[in-house]
Each structure stands twice: as structure tokens, then as C-alpha cells.
Amino acid sequence: PLNIDPEKPALPISHPFIYSIYLSKLLGSFITLGEANDTWALNEGALKEAPFLELTYSNHKEWEGMLFNALAKTKRGAVVCVFETTDSIQHMFFRYLDKGHPALKSAPAELSPQVIEDLYLRMDGLVGRVREELGPKDVLMVMSDHGFKSFRRGVNVNSWLYQKGYLSLKPGKKESAEWFKDVAWESTKAYALGLGGLYLNLKGREERGIVSPGDEAEALRAKLSEELTGLRDDFTKEAAITEAYDRDKIYKGPYKDNAPDLIIGYNQGYRASWDSVTGIVNATVFEDNSKAWRG
């Protein structure tokens, strides 16, 4: 949450340490926030769409300057530059491409689906300008961290676990505040955290685990996977979850145990609800996504 002055950094924000100082003196001051584009301000209505786009493209211009400076200096080796622009704008403006989305009613009509098309035209132009800087033996790679689909409905997996008896709350509680504040771990078998992870409350791994590793854990994973796969949204009559994948069946390698016990695969239009992501338990399993972040 801190924007550290790149010219006089109070903390190391580049390697080597003087690189941010060099860039700021050469190109001017620049944003150093980890999440530079303020998507949450737009989500909460503190920032309107037009100034959000202005902010996002201002940051984009700074990253372009750094990229072309690095390309000009680097005669041998790799130059890597990450642009948040495509991610942020699509998260916040994908609703314009989905006429049935619940958040569309609050969206300014004048922005229209043209926002994302304009974004890709701009990025295509950037790729062309980078290619002009490359030599005959240079290789250009363009990569994305994920694709996009509409996020219409949220699924609170923790609420579902509570209703099914896999997650327990403290005496007298029917809901839990974020980060599982009111969860009774001594009688909880499973919990969900993040966008797609479901974890067993495993002995020896969780601080107050009750599920024994081995046969008990494997049987519980199989049961949860079976019950979650095809979970139906009574409002839309659609399957919200296409499959809950057992990590031992889809992952291999030395870091497999770092993954959630089950990976939840959501159907098109569905995602973990905002409350479920941060461990909130409430009375609602399914809900409309009314926020601007809908891609």
C-alpha cells in the first residue's frame, strides 16, 4: 500500500539499489505500488471510470519508458517488462461485453465495449514498436498470466461447507467475520481460502487440525469433490462448479503439497464470492457480483 519515492527510496525497491534512482532521474518519478492501478477504488465507487482509465494509462506510459530504456541499453541478455494495463482494464471493464451482467446497470453507457478494443489496439501498437528495436537474432515473447470470462455470480464455498457440517462456528455464531474469526477449528474439517482453493483441517499441518493424514484425508477429499462437482445454483438452475479437482490427481513434483487439497473449477460466469475469498461465512452461498470487477 506504500508508494515509495524511487529517487530517495526509504526501502530497497530495485536491484541494484540505485536502479530506481537512475530511472527516476532519467525518466522522472514513477509509481512503485505493487498494484499500481487502483482497481479497488473503482470497485468501491471512490473513483469513476474515466479517471481510472487516465490513471491506468499514465502508469502504462511510465512502464513503456522503462522498457524502451532497457531495450536500448541491453545488447545481450533478457529484458522483461510487466504491464498491468491489460489485466486491470479487463477486470474492470469486461462487464461492458456482457449485456446480462448485474453490474452493467451502474456502468456509464458512453464507455461501451470500445474500452477493451482500444486497449488491445494500443498493446498491438506497443508490440510493433518493440519489434522495431529488435535485431535479426532477437526473440520477442508476449505472455499473459490468465484469460478472461464474465464473473456474474459468486459462490461462498465456506458458507456451503458450514451448511453441510464440514465447517463449524463458535457457540452462538451463525456467521463469521473475515479470516475465519468465528470458526470453531476443533470441529471443522475443511475450509476455503482464496479464489479456488479448498483445504482440509489436517493434523500436523494446520495448527488445530482434526483430520488425520492418510485414509481419512483421502476419503474426505473424495467426498467433498463428489458433492461440490455439479453444485447447482437454484436461482439460475445452472451448475456453478464443474469439478473439484483432487490435487494428488492433477499435480506432480516436489511442491505438490503446497497446493490446496482441492482445486475448485467454476463454470462460466461463476467465481469464488468476494466474502469466500477472505474466509467470511454467511447465510448466502450464491450471490450476484455487483462490483465493477467483473471479469
What are these regions (language model features)?
Residues 1-29, 33-52, 108, 114, ...:
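Secreted, luminal/periplasmic, and some membrane-associated catalytic domains
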Residues 44-71, 86, 121, 128:
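A conserved hydrophobic secondary-structure block that centers on an alpha-helix together
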Residues 59-95, 264:
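Active-site regions of oxyanion-processing enzymes, predominantly non-cytosolic
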Residues 92, 99-101, 161-164, 170, ...:
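Alpha-helix boundary/interfacial micro-motifs
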Residues 95-114, 283-286:
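A solvent-exposed, charged loop/short amphipathic helix patch at secondary-structure junctions
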Residues 283-295:
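Short, cationic low-complexity segments
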